Amino acid sequence: MITKRSTCLLLGGLATISQPLPVVAADDSARPAKPNIVLILTDDLGWQDVKCYDIDKPSPMETPFIDALSKKGIKFWQAYSPAPTCAPSRCAIMSGNHPARAQKTHVVGGGPPTPNHKTKWKMMAPWYSGRMPENEVTLAKVLQKNGYTTGHSGKWHMAINHHAYPQPEDQGFHWTMSERGARSGMKPDRLSDFATQKKGDKYKLDENGFPYHANSANALTFLKENKDKPFFLYYATW
């Protein structure tokens, strides 16, 4: 809880975004007219990747915090992602449009398909709009008009690439940080020289065994700076 205001917390995962959507709120008797809202969207999360949805077999993942949220909130058992890929799902979630209506049915594109293209793909993808229109009505714009301070931390990807126009501030967000954190390549592989206990490691593990996470740090900054006003945070992990 960031402040005395009640906080509504929505949790989802791409590929099965709407599979887990627990809602956590304070006592309804003390619920303000404009509760704080935190929407957490994780990338490439399957419904069996969180322990609280383990039905028949032991889960290989340990997700204690998500499990705790699910016990206090609501779990949806028959809810599905608007699309199995990144940009189409994100656009649909933010705008409320089906990917086909939003002309976002593929991950990359931005132009008409090319016939007889010499690639390894045998299928010609449909035309794909390169970006979500700036004048699109988004969740952030609606909340902004209703007195919310809106913030985004993490992945955006609602256009050809992560940094293409329009950006979050063009779609209704007062504040945005899309820092990934790790910037250098990991050699010889992604498991070496990263988040170690070495003194000079920029991403040294903390006392709980976790590396520094830029998305989380930025999200906490937004929450602390806006704790005394109604806020909406869209927290999308890379």
Regions found by a protein language model. Give the residues of each.
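N-terminal export leaders
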Residues: 1-8, 37
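Bacterial N-terminal signal peptides
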Residues: 8-19
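Signal peptide processing junction and immediate N-terminal pro/mature segment
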Residues: 18-27
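Active-site-proximal N-terminal segment of extracellular/periplasmic enzymes that hydrolyze or transfer
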Residues: 27-74
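Structured segments of extracytoplasmic/periplasmic soluble domains
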Residues: 44, 48, 53, 68-73, ...
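Solvent-exposed loop/turn segments at secondary-structure junctions
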Residues: 44-47, 75, 82-87, 99-101, ...
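Short, structured active-site-proximal loop/turn typified by the sulfatase FGly-forming signature C/S-X-P-X-R
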Residues: 58-90, 96-101, 149-151, 174-180
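Formylglycine-dependent
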Residues: 103-149, 156-238
